[in-house]
């Protein structure tokens, strides 16, 4: 997938966000080996030190671990992954609700719209 970066947000934070999303979505499943820092940095067009900083944050957060000679791997801790998905989903919901409230919608209208969407989405499945 192509890497694009926004101005005004540190690149390592954007990388971190993307990697967290890919881990949460299962693009990198539990126990999966992550690409090497240099490989991902080259793919993203960033300095390897920038990519390393994002990887260090993932490791600090317990989302990945390093095996000395084998590389970095996604945690297999189901609770950590569940918490990651919860946090990311809460962020998306907060952003969506904030944007809808700026459009003048009340909390009740937002809830009603989400329930309506969920009903339509379940009918498509």
Identify the role of each PLM range.
Residues 1-33, 39, 83, 87-91, ...:
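Extreme N-terminal segment that seeds HTH/winged-HTH DNA-binding domains in transcriptional regulators
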Residues 27-28, 57, 62-63:
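Short hinge/loop at the helix->beta-strand junction immediately C-terminal to the helix-turn-helix recognition helix
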Residues 33-44, 58:
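A short alpha-helical element within helix-turn-helix/winged-helix DNA-binding domains
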Residues 34, 66-74, 78-79:
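Short, Lys/Arg-rich nucleic-acid/phosphate-binding segment
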């Amino acid at each position: 997938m192509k890497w694009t970066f926004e101005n005004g947000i540190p690149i390592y934070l954007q990388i971190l966000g993307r990697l967290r999303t890919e881990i949460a979505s299962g693009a990198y499943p539990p126990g999966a080996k992550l690409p090497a820092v240099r490989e991902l940095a080259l793919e993203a067009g960033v300095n390897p030190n920038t990519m390393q900083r994002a990887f260090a944050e993932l490791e600090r957060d317990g989302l990945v671990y390093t095996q000395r000679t084998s590389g970095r791997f996604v945690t297999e801790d189901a609770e950590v992954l569940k918490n990651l998905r919860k946090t990311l989903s809460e962020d998306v919901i907060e952003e969506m609700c904030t944007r809808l409230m700026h459009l003048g919608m009340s909390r009740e209208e937002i809830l009603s719209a989400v329930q309506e969407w969920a009903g339509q989405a379940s009918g498509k499945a």
